[in-house]
Amino acid sequence: MFQADLLAVKRILVTGGGTGLGFSMARRFKELGAVPVICGRRPDVLADAASQLGGAETHVCDIRDPAAVDAMLDAIWQTGPLDGLVNNAAGNFIARSETLSPRAVDAVLGIVLHGTAYATLGCGRRWLDAGHKATVLSIVTTYAWTGSAYVVPSAMAKAGILAMTRSLAVEWGGRDVRLNAIAPGPFPTPGAWERLVPKPEMVDMIEKRNPLGRPGAHIELANLASYLMSDHSAYVNGEVVTIDGGEWLKGAGEFNFIGDMMTEEDWDALRKGGAR
């Protein structure tokens, strides 16, 4: 699909890059010539990911801590600047909102919103000071603009990231720093998937409500991320690209649900009644 050197020698930091979509993106970046740098909170997970990647620079970092983020970026910059940042680290769970404690809210906002801001602003300051061309890609969700029940802290955080992306795209675009976002639909990952889809019948429901009838494959998102991190997307700035098989569009249409409820007999009855 892409030339083998699409991301040649680009140094790209992927937060939460030890598992899930973060790892899948880091792996694809490396296949396309990039030098991936991954960070996370668990040394053993990072070591295993680096081994699977055939070698990668790793940093143990709790991105909720601005001092830790700054120290990590200082360490990374000792061997040269980054060329890109992928804000992927996240935390989420389903809950009735009235049961959420302040600690539960802060747990999500700290990782998703604050951590993303700390990493983006920290990289941005260094790039702008040096006049270094760079790209930021943030992983959001389709409910960043629609909202969603039962994941309110996540919806708040992702909406904030999208606002940051669009704002800084304007502020920094003229200084060679682009910012974009990807809004994924369902992409199963171990751990996170079980927390968000706790009942087997919910998996079937998710697949049925998707126009393509399936969840996304990690390589599909990783390929999109690779394009947005590459120089081929140099004129794409301040955008959010949805990759969900049309799921949110189906949910938004007033009568989209009808196709799942009507039988052939129902349609025949409508035609016989004069509907066109």
Can you say where each PLM-predicted feature lies in the sequence?
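Substrate-binding pocket helix/loop in short-chain dehydrogenase/reductase
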Residues: 96-109, 206
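C-terminal substrate-recognition "lid" of short-chain dehydrogenase/reductases
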Residues: 214-243, 248
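A glycine/serine/threonine-rich, flexible loop-to-helix segment
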Residues: 174, 184-209, 250-276
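Active-site helix of classical SDR
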Residues: 120, 157, 165
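Conserved glycine-rich cofactor-binding loop
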Residues: 16-20
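Short, small/polar-rich loop/turn modules that mediate ligand/substrate recognition or access, typified
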Residues: 86, 173, 178, 236-238
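Alpha-helical segment proximal to the catalytic Tyr-Lys
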Residues: 125, 170-174, 234
